Amino acid sequence: MKKTFETRKLYFGFPVFFLGYKDDVHGYNITTSSSAYSLGSMMVIGMRTKGNAVTEISKHGHFTVNIPREHLLEEVEIAGFNSRKDKFALTGLTYTVGETVDAPLVNECPISIECEVVELVECGKLTNIIGKVTRRVVEEDLLDEHGDFKGSEFSPISYIGDGSGRYYRYYNDHAIKMGSLIKKKKDLEK
C-alpha cells in the first residue's frame, strides 16, 4: 500500500555532473549538479537563480555538461560544496576550452557536452537553463568499432534521496538494451 509522503524534495536517481562555465573572477569554473535532462539536441539544467553559475552563464551564453565516473566523487563534493571559489584549483581537475563554446571541458570526465544558451526561464528561486547541444565528446573506450556509444558500459554517479538525506549510487553491470524485451515477447508469440 502506498502512503502520502511529505518532503521538500525527492531525487529519484539523476546523473551527477560538473556544470562548466566561463567565470569573470576565476576565468573558467565548474559546479556540481544533478538537475538536468536532454532530448535530442536540447539540454536543460536546473539551478538556483542566485548562484554563481546562473549569473555567469546568463552573461556568457555557454556551458558544458561533464559527466564523471565514481573515482571523482571527492571532486564532485568539493565542487558542489564550495560556492563562488575556483573549483579547478580546489579539486585539481583540469580543463580545455570547448571547440564550439567558450566554456571548460573537464579533462578527467569521459563525457562532455558543449551547449549554447537558448533561453533562461526563472521559476521562483530556480532557473532552468535551456541550451542547444553544439558538440558531444566521449572517451574512445566508450565507443564501439562503429563509433556508437557503449551505454551499457558507462556507469555514471547517480544522485538519490529526499529532504532528510541524499546519497550517491552506482550502476551495476546489469544492462538490458531498450526494446529487447518487447522483441523477445513478440518472438515468443510467433
What is each of the regions a protein language model found here?
Residues 1-190:
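Basic, polyanion-binding surface patches
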